[in-house]
Amino acid sequence: MERMKKRGWLLAGVVAMTMAVTACGAQNNAGTPSGGSDAAKVKKIGIIQIMDHPALNAARDGFIQALADAGYKEGEKVTFDRQNAQNDQSVAKTIADKFVRDEDDLILAVATPAAQAVYNATKTIPIVFTAVTDPVKAGLVQSLDHPGTNVTGTSDAVPIGEQLKLIQQILPHAKNVGFLYNPGEPNSVVQLDQAKQVAPQSGFNLIPQPVSGLNDVKVATAQLTSKVDAIYVPTDNTVVSAIATVVATAKEKKIPVFGSEEGQVQQGALITKGIDYKKLGYQAGQLAVKILSGADPKTLPVETAKNLGVVVNLKTAQDLGITIPDSLLQDAKKIQ
């Protein structure tokens, strides 16, 4: 009888110790998902887009796709707080401040004004930008190869010399080229400066036409059509938002519009040798994956578009009575 009592006490002690160890382990696991790995927690990414138009939307979507392809599925390993500043810098500042308060793990900034807003708000949260033409002049990084700040990303700088060569090839007798832009956008001013440098080399007289907002685009385009043989549209957020208006207004006077990226050609511009913004955003997403895995943005070089291709709108060419040389059509992406 005494022996049975001892066995009972021993069994009870073993059970009690087992329960204590189990409870302790459960408590530790509750504090650190997947056995204590901080990397397993759901990442919070704030996305600020300066305004809504197809090129910027494509860049944003490409970024999200890159993260998904790397295993960061929305709602599982990452959440996105998508915000649009509606082309208002005060709204952009409010959004940037919100991301900082929320202690986001990373911020995507789409276009120069959005990137400047978030960089002004935080020097610690990693920032990845896309669709920024000159991040050095914008004050975001110290250099393209060595950012030196909490910012890196993908630039949409386009080879304007290549665009002007397209005009030469298609319109060999053209002399005057219009340049529609918003002087309030630093990215557009950079492109204008570049165009002024290379236009004379192509034998062109560049005629800049400023616009201050969307409501000015139609009138500005109409004014240009009486002075130029062709119109070039840079990656200007204001003008690109009204590209359909630019194309329609110019078409009335049989003036071709040359674009700086594929989205403009899809909406009626004649041709471009430019950027695929979804691919550019995808590159930015790949940089974000590196940062989420522990890389420091200040050591990740700024990237530019890896592949530039010719895109031509055949319907626009037909409507304008313009023949596209076979040398361009051979490898071009064709939009009917």
Residue ranges and their predicted role:
Residues I45, F63, T152-A199, P301-T316:
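An alpha-beta-alpha
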Residues L180, P186-I255, G259-E261:
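Pocket-lining segment of extracytoplasmic ligand-binding domains
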